[in-house]
Amino acid sequence: MEHLFINTDIPPEVNAEFRVYSDDEMKRLNAEITQMDVQIARCLLIHQMLGTRISDTLTLRPDCLTRENGQDMIEIYQVKTKRYKKPISKELAKLLQSSIEYTQEKFGDTEYIFVNEKEPDRPMQYMAIKTKVMSMIQEKQLKDDHGELFGFGTHMFRHYYGVKLTEMHLDDWTIARLLGHKRLNNVQHYRKMSNQRMADETREV
């Protein structure tokens, strides 16, 4: 699977600055994302709701959905490690099913849900998505909480998801499993960011 992407397709997992979108920033960004191409919008919303790495989202397979004891589940193939399952909401399952049906109707049977339109045997490419989102941000003059044009990186959706998990008071092992981490040390980054957000909000009050 690692041969499906070139180096520029996938953003680095670790960045010098561990930033996370605020709730208001997410609302503004998603309001515009939902007006984009329908399959790109679905891909980005699913990516946010899963909290996966972008490579894992882009290589989701049409048979990834299952039900176990009445609970919707998704099977995720990780480029870096292995495959694993996690529970998902009914709303997310419906969004995934719509994405699967869209691709099947347009391209027939494919290996991936989100495909490259010119080469549907390959997954949708990250840089193509980023280019379109950045163009949208420029066109709409979409600004963050500091009055600056939005920066965009899909890792920030994962940061947002991870921080939200820590705010639910889940234990480190559960958070690591939901994020697809094999080790616990990465969870501390999300806890640190959650504490920083709380401190920032307190200062604003």
Q: What are these model-derived regions, one by one?
A:
Residues V20-I54, R158:
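Basic, Lys/Arg- and aromatic-enriched nucleic-acid-binding interface segment
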Residues Q78-K82, L179-E204:
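Catalytic-site neighborhood detector that most strongly recognizes the C-terminal catalytic loop/helix
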Residues T57-L58, G162, H169-H181:
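Active-site-proximal segment of tyrosine recombinases
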Residues E68, Y77-P123, K132-M136:
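Basic, alpha-helical nucleic-acid-contacting "clamp/cap" segments
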Residues H47-E68:
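Short, charged phosphate-coordinating catalytic segments
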Residues I40, H146-M168:
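Short basic/aromatic active-site micro-motif
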Residues M1, I46-H47, I74, A93-I100, ...:
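Short, structured motif recognition centered on aromatic/hydrophobic residues
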Residues M1-N30, E75-T81, F114-P123:
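Flexible interdomain linker/hinge and immediately adjacent N-terminus
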